[in-house]
Amino acid sequence: MGICSSSCCGGKSRDALYENVLAENEREAVADLLQYLENRAETDFFSGEPLRALSTLVYSDNIDLQRSASLTFAEITERDVRAVDRDTLGPILFLLENSDIEVQRAASAALGNLAVNTDNKVLIVQLGGLQPLIKQMMSPNVEVQCNAVGCITNLATHEENKAKIARSGALGPLTRLAKSKDMRVQRNATGALLNMTHSDENRQQLVNAGAIPVLVQLLSSSDVDVQYYCTTALSNIAVDANNRRKLAETEQRLVQYLVNLTESSSPKVQCQAALALRNLASDEKYQLEIVQAHGLGPLLRLLRSSYLPLILSAVACIRNISIHPQNESPIIEAGFLKPLVDLLGSTDNEEIQCHAISTLRNLAASSDRNKSLVLEAGAVQKCKQLVLEVPVTVQSEMTAAIAVLALSDELKTHLLELGVFDVLIPLTMSPSVEVQGNSAAALGNLSSKVGDYSIFVQNWMEPRDGIHGYLNRFLASGDATFQHIAIWTLLQLLESEDKKLIGLIGKSDGVVDMIKQIANRQMMESDNEAEDDDEGEVVNLAQRCLELLGQGGSKSHIEG
């Protein structure tokens, strides 16, 4: 505090009484402040006499005293950060408007320190702190820039401030400072830009301010923090479809930069790079481009990591990439099948399990060859082992995957031999409508063109009331989709030419009666001609079932 001491004799004229009075007040304030600073550990500088002494220096016309005040605020806020009121913030905000570089630098440092506190974040903005900070961001002095940007970065972490900052005119200067040659300024600026990417409106303001090219360019920065901030910001920006289109039009190197960052030495950068690719891969163009940019190898390495966030980001990304039919074979050939199957049982993380099984289902979607490879990788055995114990969301994905595999005529016998009925039949009683529907769809797919229907006979009444119980429940459900699945399944069984199975169906009075009701319901309402195609198909299936049961004559009885 040598400056404070010497400033007592500052160059004011002793001739004017008014200036002498001010000088006396200033001398007293400096003397008091020196005393308080000697006992700083026990002194509260944010209220009472210590704050009054500081304020006297702040509002002095003596630049040395103003510098001393700003330096004191910077020093005390370095070690004492707590909620303060406008009596404390007012003098600091006043100092921000000062034209002196030293005063600006220390005042913005003090404000940045106080802006760590949640209550202070809101009050600083309410008291008009943004405009002087924006002005300081445009200072030619790097230290002033750094402190001002750091303060705005802290303010931008509070939800209440984000929209105000976005509309304040701060985004343009922040974007320019993100390109600063000073790494501290660059880090603070990119951190602030990241904090502005958590809402649709703010993201749009950021895009309008020209931040996208700067963020993409900085992906190649050598600084890990800058890489992280820019990768995460772009990941958030890519959540919006319009922004993805803009990125696709203007940022040709984005995918390659992100693929490179999945091999960063920093796990947090790797994680965000994979998540950014995942968000981009919501669009077909990017699904293909990531594979073309040799992104599969790095993603597979992340998938095999022992670090849960890396696994999650990688499997979420590969799930989106696997949506494109052209990517199915490249992903399989890259060696993803076994690791994906292993993920189903190696973690209790519901999200990872969902992404893994959904990816396996996508990979099996468009060719029997790929379905066979997914089956050979042990996917169905793993699902059968786990499906009754996993959360409902995972059950839904697992049963959907089995239903897709069951579309392959070549695999149906193999699936039946694996004992999938043991889990599919009980799951038609799940509390989840999705799980019920997927399980029934799988049963329906397995019932078509199997060849040997003996397993259907064995499972007619068990487990859990067997196929008979499932058909009963779905036909009685009143749900058009469920009835459609059940009637279609029943028709496949009746067309099987398996006498035992057909006999069991014929003896199931409840099932037969419901088939009649569904067929008759449509015929009785046929005069209004308002039935849609789906309803008509359900009725046609029901009538066909009755014909195969030798009860098709019931139609003329009802019409008569």
Curated annotation (Swiss-Prot):
What's one Pfam family here? Answer: Arm
Q: Which top-rank group of organisms is this from?
A: Eukaryota
- Cellular location(s): Vacuole membrane
In this chain the ARM repeats are located at 39-76, 77-116, 118-157, 159-198, 200-239, 243-282, 284-323, 325-365, 409-448
The biological process GO terms on file are:
establishment of organelle localization; nucleus-vacuole junction assembly; pexophagy; piecemeal microautophagy of the nucleus; protein localization to membrane raft; protein localization to phagophore assembly site; protein-containing complex localization; ribophagy
**Which GO-annotated molecular functions does the record name?**
identical protein binding; protein-membrane adaptor activity
Name any GO cellular component annotation: membrane raft
- Cross-referenced PROSITE patterns, in alphabetical order? ARM_REPEAT
Q: Which InterPro entries match?
A: ARM-like, ARM-type_fold, Armadillo, Vac8
Q: What keyword terms does UniProt attach to this protein? A: Lipoprotein, Membrane, Myristate, Palmitate, Repeat, Vacuole
Lipid tethering residues (N-myristoyl glycine): G2
Lipid-attached positions, S-palmitoyl cysteine? C4
Q: Which family does it belong to?
A: Belongs to the beta-catenin family.
Give the function comment from the record: Functions in both vacuole inheritance and protein targeting from the cytoplasm to vacuole.
Q: What is this protein called?
A: Vacuolar protein 8
The encoding gene? VAC8
